[in-house]
């Protein structure tokens, strides 16, 4: 019996030792020399490769910001295109380091192992219809056929909204963004539903964009953000504070253009952000100039928003809830101190 107990103790020690020496996500990324980021392959403004295969978008730039913090190079990132229904499985499998793919933070997703680090875009679900349909409200869609993507909160919200308003629904479900958009554009459905940001983006892809309109109703809360696996608190914090650094930089007026000059600032908050004072990078396993690297390479949150989905982009979405907390929005970062 004593030898059996000793064997069990030895086995338990071996398992514990193996677990404790397993490389974390940060070390794995450093070893391979790049970050692997799960991305949307077809949503303009958030994640979409250009004609040269270069990914661009708000979510893409958050991935590049993480790469900049780690490698001082925003291009040391591989983008893995992922369909909506495959997001939880691929994240859990370890194929990607982080998922930043217009994904709604929900209770069921978090309890299933997707740990959301914050909200990089506050959104809500809406509807798009052809103007010739003569509908000016989602409440007039009783009996309509609606194109929707499978495996999304959008699909669930659609059913809830029609049921709550005692309307008949014909949901026409597709596996990918591209299939859903194509079906609506071809006339397969009366309406198309997704996050409002996605509607403005997808409208640009229609054969005749001016023939379509986004209805006024927003039927859900869609807090979109990055998610990581639940087993690596250091990595969770790196992804989380990358976003907070982007927000803090905008709040303090630190931009891609002036970040070098701002290192000379006497403002203590700016000096802490840029690593001139303190040693806040150490707690994350990063260099002390981690946030400086982020801003130098990708800019602050406001700059990322403007060029990808804001007034400086073809999509031209107003900041709305995504403005800073002191400008009528919800974007807010804890202090770096």
For the regions a protein language model found, what residue spans apply to each?
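Extended ligand-binding regions for polar small-molecule ligands
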Residues: 61-64, 68-70, 132-135, 139, ...
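C-terminal functional modules
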Residues: 270, 276-337
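Bacterial N-terminal signal peptides that target proteins for export
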Residues: 1-9
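Bilobed "Venus flytrap"/periplasmic-binding protein-like clamshell domains
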Residues: 36-45, 55-70, 104, 123-175, ...
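Sec-exported extracytoplasmic/periplasmic mature domains
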Residues: 30-31, 67-75, 92, 96, ...
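Extracytoplasmic small-molecule ligand-binding "clamshell" domains
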Residues: 30-99, 286, 301, 324, ...
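Acidic, polar ligand-binding/catalytic clefts
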Residues: 64, 68, 72-140, 196-219, ...
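Sec/Tat signal peptide C-region and signal peptidase I cleavage site
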Residues: 15, 19-23
